[in-house]
């Protein structure tokens, strides 16, 4: 087997003040790969023959003067633009809108905490509509008086159990809310109830990303041992859910994790009702609200584009006669 590649290119050379622009031309580049018989893979026993042929630097003719007229005012000091990077950084660093919506405060005498916020406060206002608000009201979810930013938003209730360990705090909780999604059948807005569990581990020591990520699969005898120590071992918690919580700090923001949980519940398989009839694929009518006549149309009994071929041929023969 042999492979021959030929190319020709021009490469610039360093230019001095007293010399014109020079270029180095690469005439040919031939690469031959041969494989002896008996080797199924040509990469085994390859003999390489590479030859390069260079020529002397080629001096190009002097370039003609450009006829483009450049105004001298373009290079004046008054035309320069001053960039104030400090002001720009202050404008860009506006923070996240969901920061501070759910704050855990250290308290040694409290083992259960209840929080209430809204989808709008978490930066998920596009998932909040009248449909989600009515569904949440039917579930018994209400916006408390502590939420002053969006009192009419869709409520998000968070229940947290606090488990204290040596230099650690584990927060096991559940998030309850309703988000607005599009029905997969008819396309109308529908409310999707959310009951999502989460666990956070607050440690006094800084959290570092592990070199080896454990997927949580155990085999053989290790599986039984892992089940016995499941309640006392926090290794199953993802390192992204482990937060640094120094002892001198009194509160920590967990709003981002709550927001991520709601994001994970967004699905494209939401259905407004199990008896939803969907929409007509031809005219787009919502079959839950009205009926269409697309199904009553008579189907073509011919043979596709050749169904009327006989009639067309008879008409042509009649015209000829």
UniProtKB/Swiss-Prot annotation:
Coiled coil: none
Transit peptide endpoints, chain numbering: 1-32
Keyword Lyase belongs to the record: no
Domain of life: Eukaryota
InterPro entries, per the entry: YceD (IPR003772)
Task performed by this protein: Plays a role in synthesis, processing and/or stability of 23S rRNA. Required for embryogenesis.
Annotated protein name in UniProt: Large ribosomal RNA subunit accumulation protein YCED homolog 1, chloroplastic
Organism listed in the record: Arabidopsis thaliana (Mouse-ear cress)
Taxonomy of the source species: Eukaryota, Viridiplantae, Streptophyta, Embryophyta, Tracheophyta
